[in-house]
Design a protein with these regions (language model features):
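Alpha/beta catalytic cores of nucleotide-metabolism and tRNA/nucleoside-modifying enzymes
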Residues: 2, 8, 122-124, 128, ...
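Short, charged, surface-exposed secondary-structure boundary motifs
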Residues: 32-34, 168, 222-228
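Glycine-rich, positively charged N-terminal anion/phosphate-binding segment
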Residues: 1-76
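Flexible, glycine- and charge-enriched loops at secondary-structure boundaries
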Residues: 105-109, 171, 238-242
Length: 318
């Protein structure tokens, strides 16, 4: 989730807990060897052995279309990403696709195979190479061929987002297609797409036949979703949890402000609130209250006041 699930949000969400692991925003690979500072900036978890501050393993994800340069960069990334290297063949963004990256590669299973096999050969055997894919570019006609190409190229597991590139993020997600792919390959398949609630998670597992599910936008919309799935919090969100969300937002803002490399903190917080609106109506009120604010310290004050003084926009109930 480029522009959303950065290091700071990974830190906040994994501190909340419930996650087995997480994946970085994609690191774009073109025709050069990336400098070490790229990984230090995008994936600061490498300073902690590839773990978030709460101890959740993080895997570096690479995106590109050139087998040789992906392999060379993967070999370098593997020196600081001991939990694996993930390859992105699922991004539907036009700016990525126009350069032949992300989901556009699903039009050429042969190239998928070349990329994965090149990366697998370049990365030490004890470090897993995994891949994320969609069901295709405009249709599902090559879905099985793409999954097979990734497996035969050496991918240790596949995350399958249950929509095509052209489908974007519009519901529904076609979990039944994940089941077809899982039946066609012999590596573990992880289901992904349109999992917002515990009910969605249960249906996704039942339809896809997958034991494991990757949650993205669902985790951003409900920071406690992983805990709900594990039975460690109430199955459904409630107003009583809103103060916990506000504390997450304050923590997020403080961490954003502490990072020299992060700019436009106010935009990041507003973006997260736009996701939280799906789960909590109070998020819409808070978003409206800070919409015109540009200063992150001022925004933090509004959020802290909402936490301390019930009755203010976006305030905690009670």
């Amino acid at each position: 989730m480029e522009g959303v699930a950065d290091f700071v949000l990974r830190d906040v969400l994994t501190r909340v807990g419930g996650y087995d692991g997480c994946v970085s925003e994609f690191v774009r690979v073109t025709g050069s060897l990336l400098p070490a500072r790229t990984y230090e900036r995008e994936t600061p978890e490498i300073r902690n052995g590839g773990y978030t501050a709460s101890g959740t393993p993080m895997v570096i994800q690479l995106l590109g279309s050139d087998p040789e340069w992906l392999a060379r960069n993967a070999a370098q990334a593997a020196t600081v990403s001991p939990h694996g290297i993930d390859l992105n063949f699922g991004c539907p963004a036009k700016v990525v696709n126009r350069h032949g990256g992300g989901a556009m590669l699903l039009a050429t299973p042969e190239l998928l195979h070349r990329i994965v096999s090149s990366v697998r050969a370049a990365v030490p055997a004890h470090i897993a190479v995994t891949a994320k894919m969609r069901l295709g570019v405009s249709d599902t006609s090559l879905a099985i061929a793409c999954a097979t190409a990734l497996e035969e190229g050496g991918a240790a597991s596949l995350v399958v987002h249950a929509r095509t590139r052209d489908h974007g993020y519009r519901p529904p997600a076609h979990w039944d297609w994940i089941a077809r792919i899982a039946d066609a390959v012999h590596v573990p398949v992880v289901a992904n797409g349109e999992v917002w609630t515990v009910d969605d998670w249960e249906r996704c597992r039942a339809v896809s036949g997958c034991d494991d599910v990757m949650i993205g936008r669902g985790a951003v919309s409900d920071p406690f979703l992983a805990l709900r799935i594990r039975g460690q919090m109430a199955r459904a969100p409630s107003d009583a949890e809103w103060p916990l969300v506000l504390r997450c937002l304050v923590d997020y803002l403080k961490k954003l402000h502490a990072r020299i490399a992060v700019h436009h903190e106010h935009g990041r917080v507003k973006l997260w609130l736009s996701y939280l609106k799906r789960t909590w109506p109070q998020a819409a009120e808070l978003h409206a209250a800070i919409r015109r604010l540009q200063d992150s310290i001022e925004i933090q004050g509004v959020i802290e006041n909402a936490l301390a003084q019930p009755g203010r926009p976006g305030a905690a109930n009670g």
